[in-house]
Amino acid sequence: MKRFFSVLVIAISIANYSFAQTTKTVWPVMEKQMKPWVRWWWMGSAVDEKNLSQNLTTYQKAGIGGVEITPIYGAVGYESRYIDFLSPKWMDMLKFTVNKSNSLGLGVDMNTGTGWPFGGPQIKTESAATKLITQKYTVKEGEKLNEPVKVKEAKQEAAKLQALTAYGPKGEILNLLNQVEANGNLNWSPAKGNWEIYALFAGKTRQMVKRAAPGGEGFTLDHLDKNAVKVYLDRFNAAFGNKSQGIRSFFNDSYEVYGANWTPTFFDEFKKNRGYDLRNYLRELVGDNGNKEIIARVKSDYRQTMNDLLLNNFTKPWTSWAHQYKSLTKNQSHGSPGNLLDLYSAVDIPETETFGSSYFPIPGLRRNKEDVRNVNPDPMMSKFASSAAHTTGKKLVSSETFTWLTEHFKTSFSQCKPEAEQLFLSGVNHIFYHGTTNSPSDAVWPGWLFYASVQMNPTNSLWPHIDGLNNYIARCQSVLQAGKADNELLIYWPVYDVWNQAKGLDIALKVHDVDDWLHPTAFYKLATSLSKNGYSFDFASDHLLAQSTVENGLVKTAASASPYKVIIIPQCEMMDLNTFNKVISMASCGATVIFQELPKDVPGLNDLSVRQSQLKTALGKLLFTDLKDGVRQFKTGKGQILLTNDIQKALTYKSIKREELTDAGLQFIRRAING
């Protein structure tokens, strides 16, 4: 029961302190967003006003605060009831749902699509998810290529040749694209030596929308292409009549776009943002150079460009589109091939998820072996979403909760409660159950079901008792949504260490793969150690630090965010030169910056020797003096830079106190109200 007290006792103490000054009521006034919400699957969109009204009323009486509509495939045998997504009849059902929910005091969110990921019939081949296809040829001196330069992969008739680069025996590099004839023949032969030629085609992944609802079937869109995103959203504009539909928030599920590692404008965007022509490095891009350092640097630049494209061509435009309808965006950024912190920060409500069950040292708590996944839900993974909200001053952090917690109808509330509390402790304050299916009254028990759900359904035998769990979550969230996060430490996430790998191409940062990209890192080990020892913190990206300021010795990441006492730079190999210079500048302005180790190198390939020299010069200016306990100090301007392998010793030196309750196995979260 330790985790129960860790949430409840701290929450009550905050509530008493905060509200006693203005009212006799201990708890905040209950609002719908404080209650648990639920993902609400519309199977086949086979809905009608009678059953919608009945189900919404049932949810409201049980203490549910809102629904998140996600249309999916239909139930077999009920095809006559299916309604095509975004058709006039479907829009009538949406309007009825919103109006009925409003009358009941419920909120309505909506998936900006059906199933997952985004895609549908409006996405034709030219707007579909794109992948790069490479082919290698060898040409001898004085000879011509004996085959046309055409894509060999099956079902890639629409693939377009975008680059043809030849590499000579003495390091020569030639761009031969303009020497390819319309029939694919290469009108070129090497004058001396044997040459290797690499062709790059923009092909298509051919991925379809998974679990699509009627009217939502089709190709997955190219999330990296702004024009494709516009094509996708224009279908909604037409259905909505460019008018607000009363949706609180549009939702996007976790990024499960497989193999989409390219877009037709990639070369141009790469050259604009990275400063050199990727066409000259096709050999390195496919990993054939042999120089792993150069390969890793090129691929780091490639991955950073992927991040830029996803952020600027999809996430931000999608959010701007939602705002035009007076709605918010709620996004699961995990799984994306980009900087999760920046992607989460670009939306209104960052959303994490739990998948499978966690181990809790609670005597008698059931955990069946089939419920144990390859990776347990990790609070540090959830902190990527909560950090993005905290550092940008956003109020809500949501979670897709209890996904595959157990098998159908085997989930007890005793298993749900600690999972929810673990989310609260990671900064989540807006829980979405995963979930419930809209089931008609004439469906034979147990009604229509979705396979990955814990079945928060009225047909569940636990439903008569669900108000107890709902009320507990609502009371916790009513406090956790009050005020704002009050974490003291800001920990830099060295994303370039993740990107600087010679293996693979894009790196999808999935919750299921944290053993690969998160757990082995010094960043993760430091964060877990600080958490266990009673310190509270958020994570920071390069972009966040670039726009942060210093006021009275505290770090301000946003006008509406709580300030931070310290910036911590974990041990990292790679650090962007601009980021390094910025944190040094912030120290000069009065901030305290703690390095676990000084960075060793700069990422990327362009102007490498120049940037390495600049980093070396900047590092040479940091003349540290010894303090005590292995802590070294460099004073600069109004602030200071500390250097130590033991971050906790530096925090002790700065008189930043830890919460000693963690010594007893308790956990906590900090909130500030009127402060």
What are these regions (language model features)?
Residues 1-23:
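Bacterial Sec-dependent N-terminal signal peptides
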Residues 23-66:
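Mature N-terminal segment immediately following signal peptide/propeptide cleavage
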Residues 37, 53, 66, 85-116, ...:
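Carbohydrate-binding surfaces of carbohydrate-active enzymes
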Residues 41-50, 221-223, 405-412:
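Active-site mouth loops of central-metabolism enzymes
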Residues 48, 220-233, 377-378, 465-469:
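Phosphate/oxyanion-binding active-site loops and adjacent basic polyanion-contact surfaces
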